[in-house]
């Protein structure tokens, strides 16, 4: 029986406690944001640094950076996180994870439940963080269009299996990916997922 392992920075983290994984440099923003609703926005952000041991000066510097990346949170810093909008809560969750000073930030469905304009704003901020903080970012996302726009490399999964992978710009221009995952036909028009014949879908990944 095959037993999968998860390795990060050459260390097996399969059975490690979450706190130890964070100390190794991996942080995660779970699906649905999951902020501490009874804490203020600022308290939520600060709690992300609880595993750090690099000194208060460095932590204070990163704390200031979070408000530079997400200036809208400055205006609600003392508000209970539970009373914030979905977009604000997503920003809080990302800022909280970044306060752990991760080498890799993992985002699970960051667009879930957000309006299209907010989705684009969140992904633009994530892209900026990737460039400015030199942080590797791994995103699990069903919105293929925007995910392929901001990423450098992508994997397409179906039923838990990787069926296609490659550079994002190449996948973005792949006719099959455009038609099925982005609803764009070869003629440039948009196409509903319901209009894509299932036999074509099966044939592509065989």
Predicted regions: what they are:
Residues 153, 165:
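Short, glycine/charged-rich "phosphate-handling" switch motifs in NTP-dependent
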Residues 80-84, 88:
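Conserved ABC ATPase signature
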Residues 120-134:
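Helical segment within the ABC ATPase nucleotide-binding domain
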Residues 99-103:
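A short, proline-enriched helix->beta-strand linker immediately N-terminal to the Walker B motif
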Residues 184-206:
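ABC ATPase nucleotide-binding domains
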Residues 16-18, 39-41, 46-59, 69-71, ...:
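ABC-type ATPase nucleotide-binding domains, specifically the catalytic core motifs of the NBD
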